[in-house]
From Swiss-Prot:
Keyword Glycoprotein among record annotations: yes
Cytoplasmic topological domain: 1-11, 88-90, 145-155, 207-271, 329-334, 389-401, 451-492
Gene that encodes it: SLC2A1
Membrane topology, from the record: Multi-pass membrane protein
The protein's name in its UniProt record: Solute carrier family 2, facilitated glucose transporter member 1
PROSITE patterns: MFS, SUGAR_TRANSPORT_1, SUGAR_TRANSPORT_2
GO terms for MF: D-glucose transmembrane transporter activity
UniProt-listed Pfam families: Sugar_tr
UniProt-annotated glycosylation sites, renumbered to this chain: 45
Known partners and oligomeric status: Found in a complex with ADD2, DMTN and SLC2A1. Interacts (via C-terminus cytoplasmic region) with DMTN. Interacts with SNX27; the interaction is required when endocytosed to prevent degradation in lysosomes and promote recycling to the plasma membrane. Interacts with GIPC (via PDZ domain). Interacts with STOM. Interacts with SGTA (via Gln-rich region). Interacts with BSG. Interacts with SMIM43; the interaction may promote SLC2A1-mediated glucose transport to meet the energy needs of mesendoderm differentiation.
Catalytic activity: D-glucose(out) = D-glucose(in)
Source species: Oryctolagus cuniculus
Residue ranges of the region described as Disordered: 468-492
Compartments (UniProt record): Cell membrane; Photoreceptor inner segment
């Protein structure tokens, strides 16, 4: 099949931009809790004194703070696993629109928690916005993938990750003590999430529903055709419609796909395994360990103003996501993911050497900063953006919601595990903690090389057909036959 149009219309960018506001929320709420830790802990202490007339015990304070951080991921797990309940019933766009109610409720709870002298409100607000973000990590890549032409699906899919990293960077800047990360303004820092939620409520009603959802799920061909014409800026959308109809016919021949069926069926087992491992490669790469504890890592490295070095890593994060956006359709998803994993492994080794020799060689602090920035840069080349949207590419319309739910749940669960365990593992292993991530990165590289297909330039149905046709005879084929960049349909 010839590559589809690369024309970027205003309607397409409005749709993608409106959706990506949810990605920005995810990034912001991931990064916002770190900077104001000390002032929020003091709020917990003052609240405890107000209630019980004594200072809070250090162990209780640590537990409350850990809960405040971790409850976000628990909410994310629940939200990500619930994606399929909404998108098939209400549609992709309407699901994103409805979920902003959760963002408004969370903003109110966290914004008024200090006034109400209730740390329970803050923790509940973190849980609710976690549910919102878990749903968003499923809704946004699915919607963007379904409204984008095949030739632009990778580049536009990368915008989800760009939204996340911009959100993290905004949170890092707003969290500075001189802006909102102080005793007076931290409630506003946490509740400012109502702004992108309000903006999304204004923009999304102007955006179309996914044409794939309209045609394949609702059988509304005329509406789907009208939406496609607006998105493509072209009166002739026959090829897009034919591709969707073929996928619809294939879907009708299959029974409804449940989460269990994804693992039972030979046609889905390999793609769901690839989807889960790709998500694990994102979270177990060590990137969140760098983000969660970057300030303390920079302090150990001898940086005088570690908070600004952390913001510097956020800028690198954003810059290289933009780089990925421009090269993903040329280099391909699989190639960029492999480059990213290899680069991160090399930087993790450098980071380990620098931190281990820091006391003997003070100049190693500069090497550790270079290693951290390099680690972040390589992450955004591949493992950052690609797992989000390639999951939607690996599945046809029928199993896609269930697959996105499973992959998202895997992502959030591994995120939670790293967030809870890294501090203890770091205390146990010292500067050698990143050796663990190096080993994991090498394993993910091997899996990606042998098991993950290239999806660049291929329609959803072509990719799904590759898994259906090649499932029985994979082991007889060489990696070159399986993963040639132009890809036969027997790829797995």
């Amino acid at each position: 099949m010839e590559p589809s149009s690369k024309k970027v219309t205003g309607r397409l960018m409005l749709a993608v931009g409106g959706a990506v506001l949810g990605s920005l929320q995810f990034g912001y709420n991931t990064g916002v809790i770190n900077a104001p830790q000390k002032v929020i802990e003091e709020f917990y202490n003052q609240t405890w004194i107000h209630r019980y007339g004594e200072r809070i015990l250090p162990t209780t304070l640590t537990t409350l703070w850990s809960l405040s951080v971790a409850i976000f991921s628990v909410g994310g797990m629940i939200g990500s696993f619930s994606v399929g309940l909404f998108v098939n019933r209400f549609g992709r766009r309407n699901s994103m629109l409805m979920m902003n109610l959760l963002a408004f409720v969370s903003a109110v709870l966290m914004g008024f928690s200090k006034l109400a002298k209730s740390f329970e409100m803050l923790i509940l607000g973190r849980f609710i916005i976690g549910v919102y973000c878990g749903l968003t990590t499923g809704f946004v890549p699915m919607y963007v993938g379904e409204v984008s032409p095949t030739a632009l699906r990778g580049a536009l899919g990368t915008l989800h990750q760009l939204g996340i990293v911009v959100g993290i960077l905004i949170a890092q800047v707003f969290g500075l003590d001189s802006i909102m990360g102080n005793e007076d303004l931290w409630p506003l820092l946490l509740s400012v999430i109502f702004v992108p939620a309000l903006l999304q409520c204004i923009v999304l009603p102007l955006c179309p529903e996914s044409p794939r959802f309209l045609l394949i799920n609702r059988n509304e061909e005329n509406r789907a055709k009208s939406v496609l014409k607006k998105l493509r800026g072209n009166a002739d959308v026959t090829r897009d419609l034919q591709e969707m109809k073929e996928e619809s016919r294939q879907m009708m021949r299959e029974k409804k796909v449940t989460i269990l069926e994804l693992f039972r069926s030979p046609a889905y087992r390999q793609p769901i395994l690839s989807a889960v491992v790709l998500q694990l490669s994102q979270q177990l790469s060590g990137i969140n360990a760098v983000f969660y504890y970057s300030t303390s890592i920079f302090e150990k490295a001898g940086v005088q103003q570690p908070v600004y070095a952390t913001i510097g890593s956020g800028i690198v994060n954003t810059a290289f996501t933009v780089v990925s956006l421009f090269v993903v359709e040329r280099a391909g998803r699989r190639t960029l993911h492999l480059i990213g994993l290899a680069g991160m492994a090399a930087c993790a080794v450098l980071m380990t050497i620098a931190l281990a020799l820091l006391e003997q060689l003070p100049w190693m602090s500069y090497l550790s900063i270079v290693a951290i920035f390099g680690f972040v840069a390589f992450f955004e080349v591949g493992p950052g953006p690609i797992p989000w949207f390639i999951v939607a590419e690996l599945f046809s319309q029928g199993p896609r919601p269930a697959a996105v739910a499973v992959a998202g749940f895997s992502n959030w669960t591994s995120n939670f595990i790293v967030g809870m365990c890294f501090q203890y593992v770091e205390q146990l292993c010292g500067p050698y903690v990143f050796i663990i991530f190096t080993v994991l990165l090498v394993l993910f590289f091997i899996f990606t090389y042998f098991k993950v297909p290239e999806t660049k330039g291929r329609t959803f149905d072509e990719i799904a057909s590759g898994f259906r046709q090649g499932g029985a005879s994979q082991s007889d084929k060489t990696p070159e036959e399986l993963f040639h960049p132009l890809g036969a349909d027997s790829q797995v």
